[in-house]
């Protein structure tokens, strides 16, 4: 665990807001490798692309990690027609969202099926130490929430397949067919409806969006720079999360006691 902003003693957190994909679950590991070729194909019209376009797409995907998928597809739809190489391409961002989801779910569905059939343990698709960490937080009376840019039914289904849905007071994914961000709504609920102060809330995620949101609310922030394939800290994610203002960087939840101490627990 890397502490970036050392703080004086704080009160124990009462609620933790988690991102899901890449923070708790690895069921969607490799989503970038699905989104990138889709974007390149659509922007170029299948005519090939240069290194500059590839770098642009990679940079956008990295910077947009954690936001609602439809907003990524709105960027794609605009970029397709801005480039002019694919004038016959659809203009509707929801078309791109549907095509991306179709491609992605080809691999995600197989992983979920292997879980539900008992062919692999849930640890095969959980970030290291995540379930133990969730259990410990619940055992200490902390309320846990999920807010994800992935479609709400899919987040709920995948959390259940992993057996971690029972730890969360609320799981909020993106409303199907709507452009509403669940992360801002859940944070507002914690601060307003639950009557919590920012320092009583922590935000844990691998995207800059949720870390920025946590910083704005005065919450404690743990940037999870997960290397989903190999374990440890992903250097690119680390830099992005540092720029977003994360208080702490970790590669997973294996340093449980240090993370709990940071949360005042």
Regions found by a protein language model. Name each.
Residues 247-255:
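Short acidic-hydrophobic, aromatic-tinged amphipathic segments that line or gate anion-handling sites
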Residues 32-84, 111-114:
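Conserved phosphoryl-transfer catalytic core
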Residues 181-214:
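Conserved Lys-Pro-Asp/Glu-containing loop-to-beta segment of HAD-superfamily phosphomonoesterases
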Residues 203-248:
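Acidic, Mg2+-coordinating phosphoryl-transfer loop and its flanking beta/alpha structural elements
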Residues 5-6, 12, 17, 109-146, ...:
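Short, acidic loop-to-helix structural element flanking the phosphoryl-transfer center
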Residues 2, 78-132:
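Metal-dependent phosphoesterase signature
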Residues 1-55:
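Active-site neighborhood of HAD-like aspartate-dependent phosphohydrolases
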Residues 121, 131-145, 149-175, 192, ...:
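Substrate-recognition/cap helix-loop segment adjacent to the acidic, metal-dependent catalytic center
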């Amino acid at each position: 665990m890397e502490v970036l902003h050392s703080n004086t003693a704080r009160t124990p957190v009462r609620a933790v807001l988690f991102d899901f994909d890449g923070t708790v679950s690895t069921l969607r590991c490799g989503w970038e490798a699905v989104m990138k070729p889709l974007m390149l194909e659509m922007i170029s019209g299948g005519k090939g692309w240069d290194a500059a376009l590839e770098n642009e797409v990679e940079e956008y995907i990295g910077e947009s990690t954690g936001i609602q998928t439809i907003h990524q597809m709105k960027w794609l739809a605009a970029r397709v027609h801005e480039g002019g190489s694919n004038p016959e391409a659809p203009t509707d961002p929801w078309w791109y969202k549907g095509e991306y989801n179709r491609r992605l779910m080809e691999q995600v569905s197989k992983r979920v099926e292997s879980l539900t059939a008992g062919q692999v343990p849930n640890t095969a698709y959980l970030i290291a130490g995540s379930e133990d960490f969730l259990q410990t937080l619940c055992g200490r009376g902390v309320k846990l929430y999920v807010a994800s840019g992935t479609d709400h039914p899919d987040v709920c289904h995948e959390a259940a397949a992993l057996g971690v849905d029972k730890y969360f007071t609320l799981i909020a994914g993106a409303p199907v067919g709507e452009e509403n961000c669940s992360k801002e709504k859940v944070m507002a609920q914690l601060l307003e409806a639950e009557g919590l102060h920012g320092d009583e809330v922590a935000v844990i995620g691998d995207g800059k969006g949720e870390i920025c949101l946590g910083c704005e609310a005065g919450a404690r922030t743990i940037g999870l720079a997960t290397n989903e394939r190999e374990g440890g800290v992903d250097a690119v994610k680390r830099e992005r999360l540092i720029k977003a203002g994360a208080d702490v960087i970790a590669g997973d939840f294996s340093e449980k006691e240090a993370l709990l101490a940071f949360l005042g627990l």
